[in-house]
């Protein structure tokens, strides 16, 4: 049986519908897995015209009704977009509410094991708020709906997998958050997350300061917090090394020396992956009962409705979901 990937259509006023229909006609995807989109049929039909793709939108009530063949996109139509009021590139409460409902349905399917993974399209924080959806993004929504305490984000591009010790906080606060306890906790969590994907091997922890502090010469975080955490993790049996200078560790990961890198703050990991290949850097959410991959770009309101958006990131997100889904384990 072929892997089935659920895709929530995303914000109807953004580029989500366009990247969905472009992905659905990609030969790479047709050869790899089956897609089920949760969205609005009329929006997707309009997207096929905008993007000039030859694709029939086939409405289904459940996964079993799907026609998984070339030229057909199976859609669970929630019928929650008024085409008379839809405006591309605009913040609309209707669209934020609809985007949330698509995600919610995807989670239901994943929790019921009807699909093997979820690959998400962009949503807009302002639209969510306008639609009275009190979440700031996908990760928080997915965590809440799946009763997952703190989902873990990993970026992947080619041989490089990157986790984040801290994410959405100021750099000053991120430095203060680098404690022995937190580093040790994340080594444990990242190792568990890799096991969910069926990945084992040596993980590296990036350094914070230039040359990892040069034994305290350029900062003492490595000496006081990071190194003691790594040494404790090694005693507990974790296959981890570091801290390794951030100017070297990501290159070494690309060479295959490490299966993953724990970066210490948001931009440290983002710059490494996105400079290497912006479009093919994919976010994976782990430490949940199901696998989720995502494009790493926004709703692109400035080009929505024009048919010019690239679907490379969406195609890569689906490919990565299909790669890991067969071996994915819900490790508690």
UniProtKB/Swiss-Prot annotation:
Q: For substrate, which residues are the binding ones?
A: 138-139, 274, 292
Q: How is the cofactor bound?
A: Binds 1 divalent metal cation per subunit.
Catalysed reactions, semicolon-separated: 4-O-phospho-D-threonate + NAD(+) = dihydroxyacetone phosphate + CO2 + NADH
Q: Where is the signal peptide?
A: none
Positions that bind a divalent metal cation = 168, 211, 266
**What keywords does the record list, in alphabetical order?**
Carbohydrate metabolism, Metal-binding, NAD, Oxidoreductase
Enzyme class comes to: oxidoreductase
Which GO MF term does the entry hold, naming one? metal ion binding
The lineage's top-level taxon is Bacteria
Record-listed E.C. numbers: 1.1.1.408
Cofactor field: a divalent metal cation
Q: Which family does the entry's similarity section mention? A: Belongs to the PdxA family. PdxA2 subfamily.
Query: What role is this protein assigned?
Result: Catalyzes the NAD-dependent oxidation and subsequent decarboxylation of D-threonate 4-phosphate to produce dihydroxyacetone phosphate (DHAP).
Quaternary structure (record)? Homodimer.
PANTHER family linked to this entry? 4-HYDROXYTHREONINE-4-PHOSPHATE DEHYDROGENASE (PTHR30004), D-THREONATE 4-PHOSPHATE DEHYDROGENASE (PTHR30004:SF6)
Protein name listed in UniProt: Putative D-threonate 4-phosphate dehydrogenase
Q: What organism does the record attribute this protein to? A: Fusobacterium nucleatum subsp. nucleatum (strain ATCC 25586 / DSM 15643 / BCRC 10681 / CIP 101130 / JCM 8532 / KCTC 2640 / LMG 13131 / VPI 4355)
Q: What is the lineage of its organism?
A: Bacteria, Fusobacteriati, Fusobacteriota, Fusobacteriia, Fusobacteriales
């Amino acid at each position: 049986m072929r892997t089935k990937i659920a895709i929530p259509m995303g914000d109807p006023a953004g580029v989500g519908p366009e990247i969905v229909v472009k992905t659905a006609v990609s030969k790479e995807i047709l050869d790899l897995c089956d897609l089920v989109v949760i969205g609005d049929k009329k929006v997707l039909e309009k997207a096929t015209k905008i993007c000039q793709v030859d694709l029939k939108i086939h409405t289904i009530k459940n996964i079993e009704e799907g026609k998984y063949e070339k030229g057909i996109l199976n859609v669970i139509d929630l019928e929650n977009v008024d085409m008379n009021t839809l405006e591309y590139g605009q913040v609309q409460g209707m669209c934020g509410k609809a985007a949330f409902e698509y995600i919610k349905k995807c989670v239901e399917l994943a929790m019921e094991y009807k699909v093997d993974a979820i690959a998400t399209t962009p949503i807009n924080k302002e639209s969510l708020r306008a639609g009275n959806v009190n979440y700031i993004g996908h990760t928080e929504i997915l965590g809440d709906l799946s009763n997952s305490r703190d989902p873990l984000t990993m970026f992947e591009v080619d041989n490089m997998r990157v986790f984040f010790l801290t994410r959405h906080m100021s750099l000053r606060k991120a430095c203060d958050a680098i404690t022995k306890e937190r580093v040790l906790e994340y080594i444990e969590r990242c190792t568990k997350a890799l096991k969910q994907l069926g990945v084992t091997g040596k993980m590296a922890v990036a350094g914070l300061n230039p040359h990892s502090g040069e034994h305290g010469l350029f900062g003492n975080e490595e000496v006081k917090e990071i190194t003691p955490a790594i040494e404790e993790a090694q005693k507990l049996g974790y296959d981890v090394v570091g801290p390794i200078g951030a100017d070297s560790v990501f290159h070494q990961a690309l060479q295959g020396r490490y299966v993953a890198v724990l970066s210490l703050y948001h931009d440290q990991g983002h710059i490494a992956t996105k400079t290497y290949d912006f479009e093919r850097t994919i976010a994976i959410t782990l430490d949940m009962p199901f696998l989720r991959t995502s494009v790493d770009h926004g709703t692109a309101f400035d080009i929505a409705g024009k048919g010019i958006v690239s679907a490379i990131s969406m195609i890569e997100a689906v490919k990565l979901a299909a790669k890991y889904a067969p071996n994915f384990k819900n490790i508690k």
